[in-house]
């Protein structure tokens, strides 16, 4: 068993290697377009999930926490922290090419997460290794689906691409130009001060949740069932989220997500019963649809869509991981010294402050407006 500080070290290592790989994955994703080379790499690594966790990661953590953190950080940084973002960006790219909403496709991910949460909550109490082997098995199914899929651009998108309309050649220089855009840094302020702090809060929330039950095993089971119910609700909201975000605007969607995150963290600092932490856990399911859909729509409306993967993996995921390297270890130490409640009060005040600041730093009003970068030339 790891202490809260050691757990924070592991999460910091994952964040560190995500910092290294996410820029690479973002640039590769925008360069590859609809080609599946990167997805195949991620899928193969997912198939090795069980052997890695059982025969490599777990023994290393028991022998040496630093060595285990480094090896685990490399694998998890590639497959999950960077890989999941690359997959999200690929799905969003396919949705734009074929004129359907990303949020409606993401519903399947919510349902899958709900089923996994309920199953793993029980299986972890029996034998965690069962869960790892199931993950490798589903990765094989993913490989089959990836082989069968044939993503293509819509006919109109293909004609536009062939004529060269709206084309801006992808290059490292083009991506680097983002660093000179004030609106890019305004987006970073939101990601680091709100989304990143919230992610660090959520990393060890399961441990806080389990402390309200008679035994950790019972807490794990209840946490799994609550997550299942919440993710099913998440799926419903995610299906409706594109229409809601189109109406209120991407900026307001991100601000709404920030307020929900702040309420959940601050509420957790005052929670005193199992019922209260269950309700607070359910708030997560309202926040995720607004954050994900709002982020992609904000990127596509405020920046060049050809750099969507780079913006998502660097501007969103990488920024969260970069700040997470520092925050995870610091917050883990706070949990050990002042306890969950006091730490949550501090984190909640931080997210609320940055959410209010984002009213100024984020670009856009109530409606999504095209930019000069995304409009075709007259």
Labelled PLM ranges:
Residues 9-27, 225-240:
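Central cavity-lining transmembrane alpha-helices of secondary-active solute carriers
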Residues 20-34, 124, 236-250, 335-336:
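Helix-to-loop junctions at the C-terminal end of transmembrane segments
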Residues 35, 122-139, 333-353:
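A membrane-interface helix-boundary motif in multi-pass transporters
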Residues 37-52, 252-267:
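Structural signature of the two symmetry-related core transmembrane helices
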Residues 72-109:
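Cytoplasmic helix-loop-helix junction between adjacent transmembrane helices
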Residues 306-337:
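A late C-terminal transmembrane helix in Major Facilitator Superfamily
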């Amino acid at each position: 068993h790891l202490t809260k500080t050691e757990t924070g070290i592991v999460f910091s290592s994952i964040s560190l290697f995500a910092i290294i790989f996410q820029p690479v994955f973002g640039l590769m994703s925008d360069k590859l377009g609809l080609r599946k080379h990167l997805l195949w790499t991620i899928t193969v690594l997912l198939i090795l999930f069980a052997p890695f966790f059982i025969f490599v990661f777990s023994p290393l953590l028991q022998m040496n926490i630093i060595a285990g953190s480094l090896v685990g950080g490399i694998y998890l940084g590639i497959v999950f922290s960077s890989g999941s973002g690359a997959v999200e960006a690929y799905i969003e790219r396919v949705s734009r090419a074929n004129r359907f909403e990303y949020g409606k496709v993401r519903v399947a991910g919510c349902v899958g997460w709900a089923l996994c949460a309920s199953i793993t909550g029980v299986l972890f109490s029996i034998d965690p290794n069962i869960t790892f082997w199931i993950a490798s098995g589903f990765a094989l199914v993913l490989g089959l689906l990836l082989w069968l899929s044939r993503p293509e651009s819509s006919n109109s998108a293909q004609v536009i691409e062939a004529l060269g309309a709206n084309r801006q050649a992808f290059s490292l220089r083009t991506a680097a130009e983002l660093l000179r855009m004030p609106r890019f840094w305004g987006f970073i302020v939101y990601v680091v001060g709100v989304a990143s702090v919230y992610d660090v809060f959520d990393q060890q929330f399961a441990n806080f949740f389990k402390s309200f039950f008679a035994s950790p095993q019972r807490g794990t089971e209840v946490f799994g069932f609550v997550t299942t119910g919440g993710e099913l609700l998440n799926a419903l909201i995610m299906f409706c989220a594109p229409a809601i975000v189109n109406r209120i605007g991407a900026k307001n969607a991100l601000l709404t997500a920030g307020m929900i995150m702040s309420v959940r963290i601050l509420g957790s600092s005052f929670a005193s019963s199992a019922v209260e932490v269950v309700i607070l856990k359910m708030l997560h399911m309202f926040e995720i649809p607004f954050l994900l859909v709002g982020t992609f729509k904000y990127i596509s409306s405020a920046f060049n869509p050809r750099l969507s993967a780079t913006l998502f993996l660097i501007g969103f995921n990488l920024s969260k991981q970069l700040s997470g390297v520092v925050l995870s270890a610091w917050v883990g130490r706070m949990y050990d010294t002042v306890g969950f409640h006091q730490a949550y009060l501090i984190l909640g005040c931080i997210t609320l402050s940055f959410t209010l600041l984002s009213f100024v730093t984020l670009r856009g009003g109530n409606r999504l407006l095209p930019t000069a970068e995304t409009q075709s030339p007259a």
